[in-house]
Amino acid sequence: MLRPILAAYREAFAGLNRSVWLLSLATLVNRSGTMVLPFLVLYLVKNLGFETTEAGVAIGLYGAGGVLGSYLGGWLCDRVAPRWVIAGSLALTGVGFLVLGRLTAHPSIFIAMVLLGLVGEGFRPATSTALAAAAPPELRTRAFALNRLAINIGMSFGPSVGGFLAMRSYEWLFIVDGGTCLLAAAFLLVAFHGGTVRSEKQETTAHPGRSPWTDGPFLVMMGLFFLLALVTFQMTSTFGLTLRDLYGLREGEIGLVMAVNTLLIVAFEMILVHRVGALNPVRLVGLGGFLFGLGFAMLPFGSTFSFAVCAAVVWTVGEMLSFPLSAGVVANRAGDANRGVYMGLFTISFEGAWIFSPILGTWIYQTWGPKTLWLGCGVVGLVLLVGFQAVAAWIERERKTA
């Protein structure tokens, strides 16, 4: 029984080259030190005397800087090697966190948050561009899944350690987070001093030089990705409120429900992505979005810890289908010369939702109630299912006439 399971894991990871593994390792180092942002609101309110709304503005300013940073990072990747963009983003972010920990005045912190978002979020499209260049088209989705595995392992470690450090002194959060950013940048420069391994098979689109701004299916997918992210980011805002208010769960139990998401991704995402590799990825992204919405739409119909876990399992399966596959779809849609811009715009669709999702979600939660919010997420899931099926049909017609 154990042998087939081990064989499935070997198959899921097989074929990924050295560059993909090293990029994912750098991500793991970086995410293992992620401590500042998860605790920033608490730090600003508790230590610096910010009002809750002012702390929210600071987070929003980071997101606003991140929108520009995502596009800039992708744009730069079409002009210089992505590894330089990644290393530069990490190094500047590391210095930025060290400086932020020394600031106390409101205006200086607001300015610092914009700049941190600008330099920090360029890391995402640059990493995606580097992964796409390193992996052949048929392995790109698995390369993105491996990077997501590194993110989830790191994020399960960093914030938990950060909580203990914060009890001693918040200063340690800025030191450790900044230090791991600098360490990851140094690791990349050393590991890739001779350049990255590039796949021999690159161009996968019939229009390799086409601008993303004239790519109809991609622009529609941008809107759908934004809707997907609006639903997704409820996990970091109103999901916890619902488990507290409607389910009566305490912080520890809420943390366990959240942990189900990470555990399932770490254990099964690579295998799942490998198993569905022969199916239409655009249609699967739509199915993933539907399951995301369905898992959230289940919430008003239960009130127990076990039911919350079941709902988390459903939307986690949706996440495992939609997130790595969507990155692969965008990477394969682009040509070599403009993949950075494509990945930058793809990242912007999520960065934009990061700004609006908590505002919209909490407003609906307070004004119309949690049931309306979660059933609304279910409706969005249906829109995503239908929308991505329509885009898939559009792309198939496009290929036939190319």
Where are these regions (language model features)?
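Structural signature of the two symmetry-related core transmembrane helices
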Residues: 84-98, 283-297
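Symmetry-related core transmembrane helices of the 12-TM Major Facilitator Superfamily/SLC fold
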Residues: 174-189, 374-389
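Helix-loop boundary and gating motifs at the non-cytosolic
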Residues: 13-63, 219-224, 229-257
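Helix-loop junctions at membrane interfaces in 12-TM secondary transporters
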Residues: 101-112, 300-311
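Residue-level signature of mid-helix packing/kink "hotspots" within the transmembrane helices
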Residues: 35, 63-67, 71, 155-156, ...
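Helix-to-loop junctions at the C-terminal end of transmembrane segments
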Residues: 69-81, 268-281
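Cytoplasmic helix-loop-helix junction between adjacent transmembrane helices
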Residues: 113-153
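Juxtamembrane intracellular "pre-TM" segments in multi-pass secondary transporters
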Residues: 1-17, 193-223
